[in-house]
A protein has these predicted regions:
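ABC nucleotide-binding domain "signature motif"
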Residues: 57-67, 213
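The feature captures the beta-strand-to-loop junction immediately N-terminal to the Walker
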Residues: 36-38
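Glycine/charge-rich catalytic "coupling/switch" loops of P-loop NTPases
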Residues: 224, 254, 258-281
């Protein structure tokens, strides 16, 4: 059964640098929740901490109602798909997919059943007897996904899983990930620096910068209503014009700029008359 993930006031420092700085968020069951941000913003450090692969200095992690802060990784019942697929070259596709089940002492017959079911989900059952070197990059990614799904986790963690694929394959795998998410109903926590990936796949996005979450919302809301200059610049191509707030008339904010007077949305801009602001064009 899919479970929500809750992160409360997590801090992780490397020396004097706070890689994760008092971060809190909560997903809902079955949500595809993205951690989006530039390199070095702390998103992968945070994801690894959720998985139990990295310790934090303070904070709490919950999976559903279960506190998992000190729970070892193999007992959290989350599965992780890494940037590097980490497939055993000497094993077949099915053997790779069922490897984790073997570590859990699942019987051979049940392992095969669950492994083939996972391969069916990613449309790779017909290639169960192949070795990884006989597969394309996209097929190897599907095998890595199937290996995670075979564990029947409460949540799936993905660390930039499409970054090693070419542009065409990335587009194809985005569609596959959306289909798999809809079919399984799993809670997915997904890390990426790719804005298009996040905006096209996510139910909600947490935008990170310098170890902090600066904005959370649906992709459309973040794109059309960025909460800061950083969000506007990072989430899309935009021209930022410096201006001064004048007044709101007929539901539109009027901003005086070097280009002249601009009439902007939204009308509920929390600005005082004469206050400096940025306009996204």
């Amino acid at each position: 059964m899919s479970q929500p993930i809750r992160v409360e006031h997590v801090v992780k420092r490397f020396g004097a640098v706070a890689a994760v700085d008092d971060v809190s968020f909560a997903t809902v069951p079955g949500e595809m929740f993205f951690l989006l941000g530039p390199s070095g913003c702390g998103k992968t450090t945070l994801l690894r901490a959720v998985a139990g692969l990295g310790e934090v200095d303070s904070g709490e992690f919950y999976l559903g109602q279960r506190r998992i802060t000190e729970t070892p990784p193999h007992r959290r019942n989350v599965a992780m798909v890494f940037q590097n697929y980490a497939l055993w070259p000497h094993m077949t596709v099915l053997e790779n997919v069922t490897f984790g089940l073997g570590l859990r002492k699942i019987g051979r017959r049940e392992r095969a059943k669950r492994g083939l079911a996972a391969l069916e989900i990613v449309q790779m059952a017909s290639l169960a007897d192949r070795k990884p070197n006989q597969l394309s990059g996209g097929q190897q990614q599907r095998v890595a996904l199937a290996r995670a799904l075979a564990l029947e986790p409460d949540a799936l963690l993905l660390d930039e899983p499409l970054s090693n694929l070419d542009a065409k394959l990335r587009l194809e795998m985005r569609a596959e990930l959306r289909r798999i998410h809809e079919e399984t109903g799993l809670t997915m926590l997904y890390v990426t620096h790719d804005q298009k990936e996040a905006l096209s796949l996510a139910d909600r996005v947490a935008l990170m910068r310098d170890g902090r979450i600066v904005q959370v919302g649906a992709p459309r809301d973040l794109y059309h209503r960025p909460g800061s200059r950083f969000a506007a610049a990072f989430l899309g191509e935009t021209n930022l014009v410096r201006g001064t707030f004048v007044e709101t008339v007929d539901g539109r904010a009027r901003i005086e700029t070097p280009m002249g007077l601009l009439k902007c949305r939204p009308s509920d801009v929390p600005l005082a008359r004469g206050q400096a602001c940025d306009v996204c064009v």
